[in-house]
């Protein structure tokens, strides 16, 4: 099943060969060496989460790992990317610690084993401990990246914990996640930062939402053709 309502815990056991290794969700349990360069790597994810945000990442990842001192204790952090892309990724995640502080300040303690992001070929998704993060963003400005990784981090409260009952109420997780980026700007630049983020967002929505989504749409219930549109995500 693949839904917002069903929740489960997970065990991952993935066999791979060559330079490819599982970088999984949750806690690393170990690696079993098989014949040649084949291994089985195992992870356990013990917090119940909606089934649509369970995934595996398998490649020749290089890992940057460190610990952030959060408001409620230490928060392990991992950034994973192909070796050639890791430095560019790290250079654009300079304010991730600030985003963690903002989320814990407004939403409460971070509830998962680590904060983690993995570069992918396309798209972003709030996979807990292994957020899928588009590689193209490593060529974008620091501020654009800050908005996106803050959005995805906000989902670890709004989406991974608080979840809509049906896809037509997607606003319930996307609205607060997007606003998380605004709160991060406030943390960095004060009231002026928040006001600019909110006003820029409002102007974009007023100009573009009805153009992009075939007219003005109600947030709830959002018609199926426009669930992943501008109204929902901005």
Language-model-detected regions and their locations in the chain:
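Acidic/polar loop patches that form or flank catalytic/metal-binding clefts of enzymes
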Residues: 20-25, 109-115, 165-166, 188-197
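Extended, low-hydrophobicity, Ser/Thr/Pro/Gly-biased non-transmembrane segments
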Residues: 1-59
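Juxtacatalytic substrate-recognition/specificity segment
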Residues: 12, 39-42, 60-156, 160-170, ...
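Short loop segments at secondary-structure junctions
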Residues: 17-19, 135-136, 184
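Acidic/His/Gly-enriched intrinsically disordered linker/tail segments
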Residues: 174, 178-234
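Alpha-helical structural motif
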Residues: 6-8, 39-50, 54-57, 92-99, ...
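Secretory-pathway/luminal and periplasmic proteins that interact with or process carbohydrate-rich
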Residues: 51, 124-129, 184-191
């Amino acid at each position: 099943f693949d839904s917002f309502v069903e929740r489960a815990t997970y065990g991952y056991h993935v066999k791979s060969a060559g330079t490819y290794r599982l970088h999984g969700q949750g806690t690393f349990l170990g690696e079993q060496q098989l014949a040649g360069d084949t291994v089985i790597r195992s992870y356990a994810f013990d917090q119940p989460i909606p089934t649509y945000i369970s995934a595996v990442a398998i490649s020749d990842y290089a890992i940057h790992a460190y610990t952030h001192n959060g408001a409620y204790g230490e928060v392990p952090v991992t950034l994973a990317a192909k070796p050639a892309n890791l430095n560019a990724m790290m250079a654009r995640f300079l304010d991730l610690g600030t985003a963690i502080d903002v989320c814990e300040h407004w939403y409460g303690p971070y509830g998962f084993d680590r904060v983690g992001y993995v570069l992918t070929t396309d798209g972003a998704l709030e996979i807990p401990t292994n957020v899928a993060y588009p590689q193209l963003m490593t060529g974008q400005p620091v501020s654009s990246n800050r908005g996106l990784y803050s959005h995805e981090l906000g989902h670890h409260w709004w989406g991974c914990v608080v979840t809509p009952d049906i896809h037509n109420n997607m606003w319930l997780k996307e609205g607060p996640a997007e606003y998380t980026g605004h709160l991060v700007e406030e943390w960095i630049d004060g009231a002026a930062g928040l006001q600019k983020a909110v006003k820029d967002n409002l102007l974009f929505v007023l100009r573009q939402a009805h153009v992009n989504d075939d007219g003005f749409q109600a947030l709830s219930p959002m018609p199926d053709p426009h669930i992943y549109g501008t109204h929902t995500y901005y």
